């Protein structure tokens, strides 16, 4: 197992592989330095910096659609994934390597969130865990929106990939997704002019499991998270030419944007000095019997 942690981009994982076989997705934009990030006037500047990688962290102000709230434009998926780690180091023992990072999203007269990030990477198995603690270091309550945008790419992702989620209900996000609801778990070859399809998954259990396996390369991945930490989970099915990716996205709210979430439901808010923990566990495997 090999993974690349990008200190300049929120200590996210920009590449993940097993036995030299790529499992993650690298978009056409490549690795973009945080200096070049801008939300742009339409709020979609994120897409010009969206390398995808295995995981892109999204938030803290917004996840999902760009929108305006109380006179401020919040861009697609927020900006935390484009903030460099202020401090990063590693420790290790006989069984694991731990990578620790601190990422600060602070502003004068604004929010002051600090992300304490820890990866625990096994030396004996093809597994790792990501643990995050977000702390409100400001003196006022601050809304928090958070998402792990995890991305599966070629050669793990092909028309021969098998895909499983232990959800009890699959809900299309929009009219385009309704067209593909019956095939939500079926992958197809890269297709010209394919329009993305997004599906929400709902669970009866606290432990969500998502798995992808491809017999052609005899590689698979299992991703687990706590549905109490992430009450929503979106599947992004994008089968386009050059934009060929399966996104698995545990999140704290629907992806309709900050203003809509505040209007329709109670948005997660951290009081001064309050913290919130999030985590995800990843297991890579060669044998489908481990499915």
Where are these regions (language model features)?
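Surface-exposed acidic/polar loop and edge beta-strand patches at domain peripheries
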Residues: 1-129, 141-143, 151-189, 201-291
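A short beta-loop-beta micro-motif enriched in histidine and acidic residues
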Residues: 147
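A general structural motif
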Residues: 191-193
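C-terminal beta-strand-rich structural cap/linker in extracellular carbohydrate-active enzymes
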Residues: 195-197
């Amino acid at each position: 197992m090999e993974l690349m942690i990008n200190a300049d981009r929120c200590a996210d994982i920009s590449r993940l592989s097993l036995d030299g076989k790529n499992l993650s997705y690298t978009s056409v934009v490549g690795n973009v330095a945080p200096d070049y990030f801008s939300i742009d006037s339409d709020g979609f500047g994120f897409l010009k910096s969206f390398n995808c990688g295995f995981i892109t962290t999204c938030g803290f102000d917004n996840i999902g659609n760009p929108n305006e709230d109380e006179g401020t434009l919040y861009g697609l998926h927020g900006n935390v994934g484009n903030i460099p780690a202020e401090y990063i180091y590693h420790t290790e023992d006989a069984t694991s390597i731990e990578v620790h990072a601190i990422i600060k999203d602070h502003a004068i007269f604004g929010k002051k969130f600090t992300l304490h990030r820890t990866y625990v990477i096994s030396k004996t198995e093809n597994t790792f865990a990501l643990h995050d603690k977000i702390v409100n270091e400001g003196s006022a309550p601050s809304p928090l929106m958070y998402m792990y945008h995890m991305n599966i790419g070629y050669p793990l992702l092909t028309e021969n990939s098998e895909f499983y989620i232990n959800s009890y209900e699959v809900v299309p996000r929009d009219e385009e997704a309704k067209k593909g609801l019956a095939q939500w778990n079926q992958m197809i070859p890269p297709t010209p002019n394919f329009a993305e399809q997004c599906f929400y998954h709902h669970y009866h259990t606290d432990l969500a499991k998502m798995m992808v396996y491809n017999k052609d390369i005899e590689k698979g991945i299992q991703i687990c998270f706590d549905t109490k930490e992430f009450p929503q989970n979106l599947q992004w099915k994008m089968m386009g030419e050059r934009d060929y990716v399966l996104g698995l996205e545990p999140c704290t709210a629907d992806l309709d944007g900050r203003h809509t979430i505040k209007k329709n439901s109670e948005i997660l808010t951290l009081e001064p000095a309050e913290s919130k923990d999030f985590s995800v566990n990843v297991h890579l495997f060669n044998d489908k019997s481990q499915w």
